[in-house]
């Protein structure tokens, strides 16, 4: 099961910034962007992203979208995925996390995923926060 979870995180992390800028509740917009970004080259991946990630995982009631953003940002920091982190920081703010909470998450993750990952995350956060 952990392999499936890891694959879902990587799939989520691979979406471009424009997709993650939409609030998670805007499912139709997210689906159309998924199709636009990858549907012509990877239709099955686009379908799984729409039907599993956005329509199921992000909508499950066991975690709020704010909490899902916190989990996703933490995973992206741990995996040192700065390109995907940028878009998910935007999404995290849209889902109710504050800049202070996101910086605290980066600081906390430094002790679990390493200083280089945290330093990279701080640089990305600084750029995202400046784009207000």
What is each of the regions a protein language model found here?
Residues 3-5, 9-66, 87-94, 118-132:
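Acidic, glycine/proline-rich low-complexity segments that act as flexible tails and inter-domain linkers
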Residues 68-76, 105-106:
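Short, structured motif recognition centered on aromatic/hydrophobic residues
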Residues 84:
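Glycine-rich anion/phosphate-binding loops
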Residues 97-100, 105-106:
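Compact alpha-helical subdomains of small soluble proteins
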Residues 105-109, 124-125:
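Short acidic/histidine-centered micro-motifs embedded in hydrophobic/aromatic stretches
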């Amino acid at each position: 099961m952990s392999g499936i979870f890891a694959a879902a995180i990587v799939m989520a992390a691979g979406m471009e910034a424009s997709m993650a800028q939409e609030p998670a509740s805007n499912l139709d917009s997210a689906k159309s962007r998924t199709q636009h970004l990858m549907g012509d080259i990877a239709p099955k991946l686009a379908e799984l992203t729409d039907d599993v990630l956005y329509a199921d995982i992000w909508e499950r009631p066991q975690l709020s979208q704010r909490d899902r953003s916190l989990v996703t940002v933490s995973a992206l920091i741990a995996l040192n995925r700065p390109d995907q982190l940028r878009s998910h920081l935007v999404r995290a703010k849209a889902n109710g996390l504050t800049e202070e909470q996101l910086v605290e998450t980066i600081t906390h993750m430094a002790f679990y995923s390493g200083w280089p990952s945290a330093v990279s995350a701080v640089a990305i956060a600084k750029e995202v926060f400046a784009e207000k």
